[in-house]
A protein has these predicted regions:
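Gly/Trp-centered helix-boundary motif
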Residues: 1-155, 159, 163-164, 289, ...
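Alpha-helical transmembrane segments of integral membrane proteins
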Residues: 125-341
Length: 341
């Protein structure tokens, strides 16, 4: 931390002083890393196979059944008892902790779907026979990636729009405010429902639609910061010296505005994850079969006789959002100079 400026060192000290937010950041980082490595934790393929003095990495490469002594050239099914016996007789395999992928079905269970937690399925199976824990891992990754990308794109658009309005003011600011007022009044959910009847919704399609109608969150903050700083003496001096508007905006004014927007980012990320979860719960989100926390919540509602579905999905969403809220509160305290360490 010695490389940080005194101001940033004080901010970091205030952030660490908020123990709840500080440890929430570490827990969130661990959960994020685990979700990014979902294939190494939950997969229906082994990590490494040693078969007849040859090495195979099924988690990275697709092999055929004939590679393991089978009669067909179709992709190997590593859950097939025959193939597992072949590997056991002529070599060995290293498996991941959870031997089910996002769309794997446990055909070996003796109970109807959704089946309760067991030694094979630690959190049980869903209504389609998928492992709940595996789908939570993959669903968390999709939710986090969606939330991060939505936060990034919408923040960039909001910062640019707010900077232009705040710097130039006048008619540009007036017309910009009126456009934002009209645009923010659009019924986003109904538009998504309408478009879902025309095209098949997907990850990038949903991301584009939500960015299109969700970029206004930071406009007001950035606009107010630019309206405040554009009258400073050093800004007027730069204008008098002939410095270009772009250089003034991005080099001299934007760093001050970014500080004000950083405190909002964890809450925007929280809202982005909630948006995808809500759309999936309503049936207008990711394609059918995609691992999703919202879809798992919907299954919990439709299968009240299987409480592990709703409980697991609810706790996953609640923990994720709570961590982000705690982090956001700590970031807000860190950038508040009136907070004592």
């Amino acid at each position: 931390m010695s490389r940080l400026s005194p101001v940033n060192q004080a901010r970091w000290a205030r952030f660490r002083h908020n123990r709840r937010g500080y440890w929430s950041l570490w827990i969130f980082a661990v959960l994020f890393a685990l979700s990014m490595c979902s294939e190494l934790i939950a997969n229906d393929k082994p990590l490494l196979v040693h078969f007849k003095d040859r090495w195979y990495v099924p988690v990275l490469t697709t092999y055929s059944e004939s590679d393991f002594g089978g009669p067909f050239a179709t992709p190997a099914e590593y859950q097939d008892p025959w193939l597992r016996e072949q590997i056991a007789q002529h070599g060995w395999a290293i498996w991941v902790p959870i031997r089910f992928g996002a769309n794997s079905i446990n055909f070996a269970t003796s109970t109807p779907f959704p089946s309760p937690p067991s030694a094979q399925n630690w959190l049980g199976t869903d209504a389609n026979g998928g492992d709940v824990l595996a789908r939570i891992l993959y669903g968390t990754r999709i939710s986090l990636l969606f939330g991060l990308m939505l936060t990034l794109f919408s923040s960039v658009m909001g910062v640019v729009a707010g900077a232009v309005q705040g710097y130039y003011g006048g008619k540009i600011d007036l017309w910009g405010q009126r456009v934002i007022e009209v645009w923010s009044g659009m019924p986003t959910l109904f538009l998504i429902i309408l478009l879902s009847s025309v095209v098949q919704p997907g990850f990038w399609w949903l991301l584009g639609i939500t960015v299109l109608f969700g970029w206004m969150a930071l406009v007001g903050v950035v606009r107010a910061e630019f309206l405040r700083t554009r009258n400073y003496d050093y800004i007027r001096a730069a204008q008098a010296l002939g410095v270009s508007d772009g250089a003034i905006i991005f080099r001299h004014m934007l760093p001050n505005a970014v500080v004000a927007t950083l405190t909002f980012l964890p809450f925007i990320l929280c809202s982005s994850i909630t948006t995808l979860t809500s759309l999936d719960f309503l049936g207008f989100g990711l394609p059918l079969g995609s691992p999703s926390l919202g879809e798992l919540l919907l299954q919990g509602k439709n299968n009240l006789q299987a409480p592990w579905l709703g409980i697991a999905a609810f706790l996953s969403v609640a923990v994720l959002l709570s961590l982000l809220i705690f982090i956001g509160e700590a970031v807000r305290d860190a950038f508040d100079p009136n907070k004592a360490v």
